[in-house]
């Protein structure tokens, strides 16, 4: 279980957050010769203090350019603590990526129930987890009593809903159909966005055959010529 303590702002835009990760994930967070810790600090301009018991303290510094740097570092640490490898966790540096953590205990009534539900999410030989990942593009980690998801906003929400469907007892077939429908919606939405952009580009090219070689000017003469 991850414990997070927020100490607000200290000085100007310098926050401190303290959280705890499993002891067996401390080595992964530090990395070989401290490379993972150093990468997080360099990418976000923060400082990490990592104790052997799994307590991690994150400090904002004068080097951070992103006002959300401490929060992003917190989510990266949480993701590693929830079983993700550093390469995936570091995607959370981007504003486009988010982390969701689902507590299996919220859906279980006993230890046996927790094991059964974990098995449903993972699937035989990992099939269910891989299917969720392949249809959403998000990354899924089942670790301890949690399911964690990293990815772009919309895919993460779809993957989260699929995981919660399985935890609530929906069949794998029903869950997979849901994922297929949502994937088709995303593909259609992206196609429409691409089509609109292509239409605009094509129209502009017809209006300005050499538009890549000229500067865009919007004086009155040019507007009249275009009309």
Curated annotation (Swiss-Prot):
Disulfide bonds: none
The keyword Repeat belongs to this UniProt entry's keyword annotation: yes
Keywords, ordered alphabetically: Repeat, RNA-binding
Record flagged with keyword Protein biosynthesis: no
InterPro entries registered for this protein in UniProt: KH_dom (IPR004087), KH_dom_type_1 (IPR004088), KH_dom_type_1_sf (IPR036612), KH_domain_protein_archaea (IPR019964), KRR1-like_KH2 (IPR048548)
Originating species: Methanocaldococcus jannaschii (strain ATCC 43067 / DSM 2661 / JAL-1 / JCM 10045 / NBRC 100440)
CDD domains given in the database record: KH-I_Dim2p_like_rpt1, KH-I_Dim2p_like_rpt2
Cross-referenced SUPFAM superfamilies: Eukaryotic type KH-domain (KH-domain type I) (SSF54791)
Gene Ontology MF annotations: RNA binding
Residue ranges of every copy of the KH domain listed in the record: 14-77, 106-163
Protein name: KH domain-containing protein MJ0443
Highest rank taxon of the organism: Archaea
Matches recorded under PROSITE patterns: KH_TYPE_1
